[in-house]
Amino acid sequence: MNENLQDLISTKLAAAIANPLFPAVDSQLRSGRHIGQEHLDNYAFLADFQNELDGFYRRYNVELIRAPEGFFYLRPKATTLIARSVLSELEMLVGKVLCYLYLSPERLAQQGIFTVQEVYDELLNLADEAKLLKAVNLRASGSDLDKQKLAEKVRAALGRLRRLGMLYTVGEQNSGKFTISESVFRFGAEVRAGDDPIEAQLRLIRDGEAATPESIAAEKATADDESAVSNEEDFEYDDNQEGAE
């Protein structure tokens, strides 16, 4: 019986599944969460058993990806047996702004800490206001009431991205302050060698183009000619979904 079992599952995969960290890590990955180096134990666990767990998840038609920046996440295939993370248009746009802020000089000047208000202001500054209001199904009048509703949607979008492991609250839960994780590079612009990454991300926000899940660093370091996979294949896009889950 044991010999037959060993033919089906490797000793190292069995050790990974038996590890007390596995249930929590597995649940987080399946929920769409990104696990970076900030989570020391969980990250070390995934790094130690990456190959074995990737084979395990491929049985569900998903891949365990380790991004160039180091964070782990599950990338579903079209035939996935695990539910996909569905992001609204506004959540995608807020994610792109977070990536822009991560690349900005202000991140170092502010010790990596940003506020919800800064994201909202940057969003209004960088993106077309009419497109923003349309993205949240509001009339494009630009009234104070519309902007208030938009601000609420932005807060909800940030909450969703926080649950996906893309930002971390600083201080009190309702402080409005947070740090940005490297996993926001899931929203990074596709940049060819020699391009300014900040300018490229700025163009992405202004043009409202689809982002790619490949990081800027990977684009610069990789010489192959394969097309980058669009975010819509990783984060399923839903026109009708609002900002909150």
Swiss-Prot record:
GO cellular component: cytoplasm; nucleoid
Function noted in UniProt: Involved in chromosome condensation, segregation and cell cycle progression. May participate in facilitating chromosome segregation by condensation DNA from both sides of a centrally located replisome during cell division. Probably acts via its interaction with MukB and MukF.
Biological processes annotated in GO: cell division; chromosome condensation; chromosome segregation; DNA replication
UniProt biased composition (Acidic residues): 224-245
Assembly with partners or alone: Interacts, and probably forms a ternary complex, with MukF and MukB. The complex formation is stimulated by calcium or magnesium.
Primary localization class, coarse: cytoplasm
Lineage of origin: Bacteria, Pseudomonadati, Pseudomonadota, Gammaproteobacteria, Pasteurellales
Subcellular location: Cytoplasm, Nucleoid
Protein family (similarity comment): Belongs to the MukE family.
Region (Disordered) residue spans: 213-245
The organism's place on the tree of life at top rank: Bacteria
Keyword line: Cell cycle, Cell division, Chromosome partition, Cytoplasm, DNA condensation
Gene3D superfamilies, sorted: 1.10.10.2250, MukE-like family, C-terminal domain
Encoding gene per record: mukE
Pfam families in alphabetical order: MukE
Protein name: Chromosome partition protein MukE
